[in-house]
Amino acid sequence: MPVITAEKQPARKRILHAAAKLFLKHGYYNSSLKMIAKEANTNTGSVGWAFKAKEEILCELVTYVFDKQFETTEKLLEGITDDRVLFFAVEATLQLYMAEANEQVREMYNVSYSFSGSAKVIYNKMTEKLQEIFKEYLPQLKTKDFYEREIASAGIMRNFITVPCDMYFEMGRKIHTFHETTFLE
C-alpha cells in the first residue's frame, strides 16, 4: 500500500466518498475510474495518484464498512448485553439483512469476498474479531485456527449473500443455517 501523505489525504477522502456513492448506485463493475473521478470533482490521473487501482479503493471501503458494522453492532447491543457470542450472531445477521435489502449492496459484499485484496482485509479483520469473541470458549485454538475458520465461514457468508431469499430459503432459515454451520452450533 502506498504511503499516504497529508497532501494526498483530502483527495483520497473525496475519491472514497465518490466511489462509495457510485458503487451503491451503479454497482462496482458499472462504476469506472472515470466516473469516480468526475463524481469526486477531479481527474483520472488524480485517482491513479491516490490509488493504484479500483480494487485498492474497494479495500479501503471494506475496511471502513467493516469497522462501522462492528461499531453499529456494539451500539445496538449497548446496555442490553455484553455477550460477545450474541455480538457475533447479530453482526452476521446484519450482514445478511443489508445484502438482502439492496442489489448493489449484495454485489459489493460479493465483490469484496471475491477479490484477493479485499478478501484478505475481511479474513484478517474477522480473524481478530473471532479470536476476541471465541478465545475464552475455544482456548486451544491459535490465531491460524481462527483464520482457517474465518475462511470457511466467509465462504458460507458469501454464498448466503449471493443467493437471494426465496420461498425455499427465507431470511429466518438463512440466519439460522449460517449460525448453525459456523461458530454457533
Name each region found by the language model.
Residues 1-7:
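N-terminal intrinsically disordered/low-complexity leader segments
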Residues 143-148, 157-159, 173:
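A conserved mid-domain beta-alpha-beta active-site/ligand-binding segment of alpha/beta enzyme cores
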Residues 14, 18-26, 72-76, 98, ...:
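Solvent-exposed, amphipathic alpha-helical segments
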Residues 14, 18, 22-56, 60:
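Helix-turn-helix
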Residues 104-111, 115, 122, 148-157:
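Anionic, Ser/Thr-rich low-complexity intrinsically disordered regions
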Residues 131-140, 162-185:
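C-terminal peripheral helix-coil segments that are non-catalytic and often amphipathic
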Residues 111-136:
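Glycine- and acidic-residue-rich phosphate-binding/metal-coordinating active-site segment common to enzymes
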Residues 60, 71-105, 125-127:
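Hydrophobic alpha-helical connector segments
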